[in-house]
A protein has these predicted regions:
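Surface-exposed, charge/polar-rich loops and edge strands
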Residues: 1-188
């Protein structure tokens, strides 16, 4: 089971009075994140973005396909707390919500195995598990092992090419512990 926990990685920022939506993709350092910006055309290097009274960022780089690099006004644990306080759950496009979603999304868009913060999208295959289902599977002899795969926002992107091998995949971070590897290797 994937034990990743989804971050509140959807941020609404303001450049002057103009609104820009950001989806955090990948942390580059203690205070720097790669993110999708919409609309990205307003995010040139040097652009100041205000997310809240306590959270600001500067666009330090801009890439293709709406990706930008943000340097935040705080770092480390303070940045994590500010993102958690300011951000919303990054729901996939097929889940329609008013801007910002609702409080229930914070709970319902996590799997019951969610533990290690880092995903910017839920491992949707695990969303249907409930404690009751897990208990029934354990009673039937199933064995559970945990891996961590921090699902990235690339999972939201459509395939826009005719030839599948031309599609650019985004990277994701994963970890399989020695204990989990041994349990998988021992399974029949």
């Amino acid at each position: 089971m994937n034990d990743t926990r989804v971050l509140r990685a959807q941020l609404t920022g303001y450049r002057g009075i103009g609104k820009i939506r950001f989806t955090l993709l990948k942390r580059a350092s203690d205070s720097v994140w790669h993110a999708f910006a919409k609309p990205a055309k307003k995010c040139t290097p040097g652009t100041e973005i205000r997310f809240s009274d306590d959270l600001h960022a500067t666009v330090i780089d801009k890439h293709e396909d709406g990706e930008v690099v943000l340097s935040f006004s705080c770092h480390g644990e303070a940045l994590d707390e500010a993102i958690d306080a300011t951000g919303q759950m990054p729901l996939p496009p097929y889940i329609k919500r008013a801007e910002g979603g609702d409080a229930e999304d914070t709970l319902s868009y996590q799997t019951m195995f969610a533990d290690k913060k880092g995903a910017v999208a839920a491992p949707t295959a695990g969303l249907h598990f409930t404690p009751e289902l897990k208990d029934r599977l354990l009673a039937a002899g199933a064995v559970f092992a945990h891996v961590t795969l921090h699902v990235g926002a690339g999972t939201f992107l459509p395939v826009k090419v005719d030839k599948l091998s031309d599609h650019k995949m985004h990277s994701e971070w994963g970890q399989v512990s020695a204990e989990t590897a041994a349990a998988i290797n021992a399974a029949k």
